[in-house]
Swiss-Prot record:
Subunit structure comment from the entry: Monomer.
Entries under HAMAP family matching the protein: EPSP_synth
Gene Ontology terms, MF aspect: 3-phosphoshikimate 1-carboxyvinyltransferase activity
Ranges in coiled-coil conformation: none
Main localization category: cytoplasm
Protein name, UniProt field: 3-phosphoshikimate 1-carboxyvinyltransferase
Amino-acid positions noted as binding 3-phosphoshikimate in the UniProt annotation, renumbered to this chain: K22, S23, R27, S170, S171, Q172, S198, D314, N337, K341
Localization, UniProt: Cytoplasm
Record's function text: Catalyzes the transfer of the enolpyruvyl moiety of phosphoenolpyruvate (PEP) to the 5-hydroxyl of shikimate-3-phosphate (S3P) to produce enolpyruvyl shikimate-3-phosphate and inorganic phosphate.
Pfam families to which the protein is assigned, alphabetical: EPSP_synthase
Documented EC number(s): 2.5.1.19
Broadest EC class assigned to this enzyme: transferase
Reactions performed catalytically: 3-phosphoshikimate + phosphoenolpyruvate = 5-O-(1-carboxyvinyl)-3-phosphoshikimate + phosphate
Length: 428
């Protein structure tokens, strides 16, 4: 297996223009495909998850042109749901942002579809979404294990009416149903069962739907009403915001070993909840400055904090490695959904943090981290999880090197991450 050893970094300084957001890129691609008219998407993320979505759209008869650097995509919208005259199998890798929304969108049209992916995808639950789609009349069967992909869909359209969605595991199930709902056969009401996790990701979905001409009534995240007779219409141009989760590594690096780092492509008006990572860093002692389309982080004396991170689960992982540089104990709470991401992130983070010397308590939905006096050089296993690889790069901001196994797994969201980090780093 390939590995990369990062030597100790004395200081970080500079500016990073963020790659496009994965969450925004795949939502916008899907809506552009369903919309009437042509959409020009700019700052699209070039990564595995986006490629899986684009490959699926090609198989579904969508025409698009991708620029040489793959960050501009012109999509000719179908102006209707997807149809297939012969059975189509779509391989979606480990891309939850493609699997869940496509599972819902494919129920709208006509045809037979099989959705499958990598072995890890077959361990990521989808039952709550399938239950809701079945309530709306969808014909879906599990081809291997109950509640998990691969799925076989016999599409005949989605009925109007009320459906129930369990919101306690992942907000992607609700996102998927919301995006399909305007093309159902009438008004749709979605009732949320349990406490909805990761609400800011729902805000992203609603914001993008609005840009494509669809209004949704949001009753305090307990009920969503999608009035009948709406359809998606291209906004013409669509700018994909920088990935706020990806910003977290650079903002944290500056807080630990700045100088200062300016991150561009997101700002105080960002639609992504993960920009609130900067607020958590500020609470820990970093100096943060907000602009319209940038955030600056400067070094501070960091102290451990005890916080609920349900609203920013992806960026919260970065807090776990930032905690290695803070005085005292850091508690990351209410992040059960780490367990159903690219890997079981609670277990993985606890295991790898202990390797570098931290004392860690892993609970069902929390992590408590006590930093060591001195970090230990370790080979970090990344579990084919892009965020674990990027989080643990921060260990090099000490006087200890760190080895990252399978560093190319960052291609899921940030293919040139390690090059970017190196360009901002002054080695010890």
């Amino acid at each position: 297996m390939e590995s990369l050893t990062l030597q100790p970094i004395k200081k970080v300084n500079g500016e990073v223009n963020l790659p496009g957001s994965k969450s925004v890129s795949n939502r916008a691609l899907l809506l552009a495909a369903l919309a009437k008219g042509t959409t020009r998407l700019t700052n699209l993320l070039d990564s595995d998850d986006i490629r899986h979505m684009l490959n699926a759209l090609t198989k579904l008869g969508v025409h698009y042109e991708l620029s040489a650097d793959k960050t501009v995509c012109v999509v000719e919208g179908l102006g209707r749901p997807f149809t297939a005259t012969e059975a189509q199998e779509l391989f979606l890798g480990n891309a939850g942002t493609a699997m869940r929304p496509l599972a819902a969108a494919l129920c709208l049209g006509k045809g037979e579809f099989v959705l499958t992916g990598e072995p890890r995808m077959k361990e990521r639950p989808i039952g709550h979404l399938v239950d809701a789609l079945r309530e709306a009349g969808a014909q879906i069967e599990y081809l291997e294990n109950e509640n998990y992909p691969p799925l076989k869909i016999n599409a005949t359209g989605l009925q109007a009416g009320t459906v129930n969605i369990d919101g306690s595991i992942s907000s992607q199930f609700l996102t998927a149903f919301l995006m399909a709902a305007p093309l159902a056969q009438g008004e749709v009401k979605i009732h949320i069962v349990g406490e909805l996790v990761s609400k800011p990701y729902i805000d992203i979905t609603l914001h993008i739907m609005k840009q494509f001409g669809v209004d949704v009534v949001n009753n305090a995240y307990q009920e969503f009403i999608i009035p009948a007779g709406q359809s998606y219409v291209s906004p013409g141009q669509f700018l994909v915001e920088g990935d706020a989760s990806s910003a977290s590594y650079f903002l944290a690096a500056a807080a630990i070993k700045g100088g200062e780092i300016k991150v561009t492509g997101i700002g105080k008006n960002s639609i992504q909840g993960d920009i609130h990572f900067a607020d958590a860093l500020e609470k820990m002692g970093a100096e943060i400055e907000w602009g319209e389309d940038y955030v600056i982080s400067r070094v501070g004396r960091l102290k451990g904090i005890d916080m609920d991170y349900n609203h920013i689960p992806d960026a919260a992982m970065t807090i776990a490695t930032t905690a290695l540089f803070a005085q005292g104990t850091t508690a990351i709470r209410n992040v059960y959904n780490w367990r159903v991401k690219e890997t079981d992130r609670l277990s993985a983070m606890a295991t790898e943090l202990r390797k570098v010397g931290a004392e860690v308590e892993e609970g069902e939905d929390y992590l408590i981290v006590n930093p060591p006096q001195q970090l230990t050089h370790a080979a970090i296993d990344t579990y084919d999880d892009h965020r674990i690889a990027m989080c643990f790069s921060l260990v090099a901001l000490s006087d200890t090197p760190v080895t990252i196994n399978d560093p190319k797994c960052t291609s899921k969201t940030f293919p040139d991450y390690f090059d970017k980090l190196a360009s901002l780093s002054e080695l010890a």
